Amino acid sequence: MQRRSFLRRTGLALGAGAVLPSLSFTSPSNVSLDSWANVRSQFLLDPKRIHMAQMFLASHPKPVRDAIDHHRKMFDESPVEYWEHNWKTMEPEMCKAAANYIQADPTEVALTDSTTMGLGLLYTGFQLKEGDDILSTTHDHYATDKSLEYAAAKNKATIRRVTLYKEASNATADEMVGTLTKAIQPNTKLVAVTWVHSVSGMKLPIRTIADAIKSINSNRSDQDRIYFCVDGVHGFGVEDVTMADLGCDFFAASTHKWIFGPRGTGILWGRKDAWNKVVPTIPAFSYPAYGMWLGMIPQGKLNFCDLHSPGGFHSFENRWALKEAFDFHMQIGKKKVADRTHQLGSMLKEGLRGVNHIKLHTPVSTELSSGINCFEVEGMTSEEAIKKLSTKKIIGSAAPYPISYARLTPSIINNEEEVKMCIAALEKIKE
């Protein structure tokens, strides 16, 4: 189908003589990211503050800012022309960049606005029947809990939540995997977990869980197969792993946290042999999906990207700048990002362990922790501790859970001196 024929059918064809704006944004390639100081220089973060909560909502590095500014300018100059010239190619380019980052097929990646949107689309669209069992945990975020509740109510399924550990700091991988797999029942069709618990900093051994579920599935028919779904947001952008490494069936994450991507962006990845388990909730506006509806493309099976990226008009200047965030990470190197994040996190945890009035809840081992570090200050609530730190220009966060711990999350924008200043401030926080 020709693009102009498609646009005539949608009421958006322009005059034959229209001069269309520049097709795309080209990010400068001469920026050196060979030192952590150079990496930090790419951000407009206030240097008078120590930013230890980028995992909540990140600042944009220069390549992402420049791309957003470019797209915004072009939309403001001629919105319809710029959209017409780019709409068919830009979202597939973003999926391609995400797929390159996770070493997956671009057709397996759908674009979302957030982890919450991804989880909502996944779980409420998951094909369950009355009596099916959903197994989850007591450590998941509100977004997972509510999405699963809506899915259960919609399908008359049941939900069970198991506690994998009482205290994260001394939990073991064997204990957690054993507890979860022992809770699987014959009618369990969906296992939903969170990779890194933002309430405690615990990082689950996703691959080990995936292998255990695969073993159980080997004795089941396809109809009774268990599907393994992961809220991966707080490992995504930290850990040097691929989707093949994790071994799950579905993976949801936002890209405006550890990825430092445009605000209001995210991905939902689905393994090819699991696509048919999820029914779309929001119609896609992809070129193939819309073209089939118009009768201008032969009917056929749509891939996950084309079918499950929600349609409608988005904040295009942000969505179309997502590639630059993934490119930024890849230019630094995924392993370097992972090593640096763990280095600073380990330094912080070791320092906090030596403070008498601090209780560290996050495991010290990097096998069971990622970039989130959760702790309590004796005699203070998490909000009080974070507020006190803010008087020292240290920006942290309080975990938004019924039981809340204070959190400091150093990332690649931080340095050793800032970590030392955080430890020193916490040593004196009760004075």
Predicted segments, located by residue:
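Pyridoxal 5′-phosphate
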Residues: 5-431
